[in-house]
Amino acid sequence: EHGEPAHIVNTSSGNGGVSPLSGTPQYAATKAAVVTISECLYAQLQEVEAHIGVSVLFPGPNILRTGLFESWRSRTDEFAKQRPRKTPYTTVEQLEAQMKAAGREIAYTPVEEVAGVVVDGILADRFWMMPASERGDETMRLRYESMRSRANPSYLRQVPG
C-alpha cells in the first residue's frame, strides 16, 4: 500500500530445495515447497510490478548450529505429542557420530557467513541466495541431467545411520 520497496527471504535447504536426502522425506518435502512457493510469489509480484523482491536462501554449504536438533525441548504443552515417541530425538552429537562412522566428517558453516549471503543477496535483488559449493553445484548438474534425459535419479544421497 505504501509503495515502499521490500524484500522477502524464504529459507530452504539443499535437502529438498536441491535434492532430497532419502531418510528425511517430510523435511525435504517442506523445503521443496518453500522453493516452489517462492518462485510463484516472485512471478506474481513481477506481474503486478510490485517493488518487492523475493529470494530463496540455501544456508550452508554445510550444517548450521541453529539448535534445530534441540527444538523439541522448547515445545509447549499445547503442541506436545499425543502419543509419546518410541525412539528418542536425534541429537547433533549423534548425527556427528553417524557421519563419522560412515567415513564422512561433518562440517559447519558460521551463521555470520549466511548473514553475509543474505545481505549481499538483498542488495543485488538476487532470487537464489546460495553460497558457492562444488558438491551443491554437482548435485544440481546431476539432477538437471537426470531430468533432461528422463533417467532415474542418480544424484540422491542417504543420511548415514
Segment roles from a protein language model:
Residues 25, 33-36:
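Conserved cofactor-binding/catalytic machinery of classical short-chain dehydrogenase/reductase
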Residues 18-25:
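Active-site loop immediately N-terminal to the catalytic Tyr-X3-Lys motif
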Residues 30:
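Active-site helix of classical SDR
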Residues 33, 40-41, 45:
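Conserved alpha-helical elements of the SDR catalytic core
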Residues 44-129:
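SDR active-site lid
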Residues 1-5, 47:
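A short helix-coil junction within the Rossmann-fold of NAD(P)-dependent oxidoreductases
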